[in-house]
UniProtKB/Swiss-Prot annotation:
Key word Acetylation present: yes
Annotated PROSITE patterns: GOLD
Species: Pongo abelii
Protein name: Protein TMED8
Region feature (Disordered): 1-80, 238-268
Disulfide bridge positions per record: none
Sequence positions bearing N6-acetyllysine: 170
Domain GOLD: 160-324
Length: 326
């Protein structure tokens, strides 16, 4: 009976709850009562021993008396596994924290391999590894080393031309009509470019022109190129041919592309080669003589453009006089 009580638990078992403890019926009442009393005394003694043993082995101070805490081996294993898992997570977190600076350094090293192309005028600061001094270099020097003879040269600002008109159109055309190479016909859809190199003895270029009956487009540009001859030449081209020629010049300059920058070079270099003195506009050259002058900005070739590309029906007779002064 003591084994059964221990299995059921000493705290939940009560002798008054068992059947037959209150006495029987008939002749068996006395015998059953004495047996019940003996059983009750024995159970009380067993309960006292079990309570003393439970109080000695129970580590929890707040557990109620006579109710020992039963801990299964499975719960102990689960607690131990939880502690191990927590320790492993903490170790992984520490490892990640240790590796984070190294990863960041590796990313920065990879980013440093890709250098951003410097534009003209940017400043490059170089830290010396030996003395700690800071050297300031212009990016133009690096561009010059990379481009060589094809480096981009920013042209100086063009001074505005001096222009005027006068009304003696008939006298002007009559005089130039008798001179050689002072009269030409600009056909419909054509553009005539008169190339005038700078002269070693001159300081400015001057021009005068007039037309018969109709106006014409006129503009002046400057080509920053070395002068090999002082001869004035006339170039006649169709409007489409003129555009194709400009594209060919762009392609020729596109060949020496700066290393590391595929978007720089040709077109910007072409713009840097030609300076605009005055844009092409339609001039009333059939009413007044159009005249002007421009001081030499340096060595190069003036491009005087007479544009009749907008006219699809009429040719224009042009009278012109171009010279230099000191």
């Amino acid at each position: 009976m003591s084994d059964l009580q221990a299995a059921e638990g000493p705290g939940s078992w009560s002798p008054t709850a068992r059947p037959g403890s209150a006495g029987g019926v008939g002749d068996c009442q006395g015998v059953e009562g004495s047996q019940a009393a003996a059983s009750e005394n024995e159970d009380l003694e067993n309960n006292k021993d079990t309570s003393l043993l439970a109080s000695a082995t129970d580590p929890e101070p707040c557990s109620p008396p006579h109710r020992p805490q039963m801990v299964s081996p499975g719960s102990k294993d689960a607690t131990e596994d939880l502690r191990k898992a927590t320790g492993a997570l903490e170790a992984q977190a520490l490892v990640k924290q240790d590796l984070l600076p190294a990863d960041q350094a590796q990313v920065l090293n990879e980013m440093a391999k890709y250098q951003v192309p410097q534009r003209s005028g940017d400043i490059v600061m170089i830290q010396s590894e030996h003395t700690g001094a800071i050297d300031v270099l212009s990016a133009d020097l690096e561009s010059a080393d990379l481009l060589g003879d094809h480096r981009k040269v920013s042209p100086p600002l063009m001074a505005p031309p001096c222009i005027w008109t006068f009304a003696k159109v008939k006298e002007f055309k009559s005089k130039l009509g008798k001179e050689k190479n002072s009269r030409l016909v600009v056909k419909r859809g054509e553009v005539v470019t008169i190339r005038v190199p700078t002269h070693p003895e001159g300081k400015r270029v001057c021009w005068e022109f007039a037309t018969d009956d109709y106006d014409i487009g006129f503009g002046v540009y400057f080509d920053w190129t070395p002068v090999t001859s002082t001869d004035i030449t006339v170039q006649v081209s169709d409007s489409c041919d003129d555009e194709d020629e400009e594209e060919e010049e762009e392609e020729e300059i596109e060949e020496p592309v700066p290393a590391g920058d595929v978007e720089r070079g040709s077109r910007s270099s072409l713009r840097g080669r030609y300076g605009e003195v005055m844009p092409v506009y339609r001039r009333d050259s059939h009413r007044d003589v159009q005249a002007g002058s421009h001081d030499y900005p340096g060595e190069g070739i003036y491009l005087l453009k007479f544009d009749n590309s907008y006219s699809l029906l009429r040719n224009k007779t042009l009278y012109f006089h171009i010279y230099y002064t000191s």
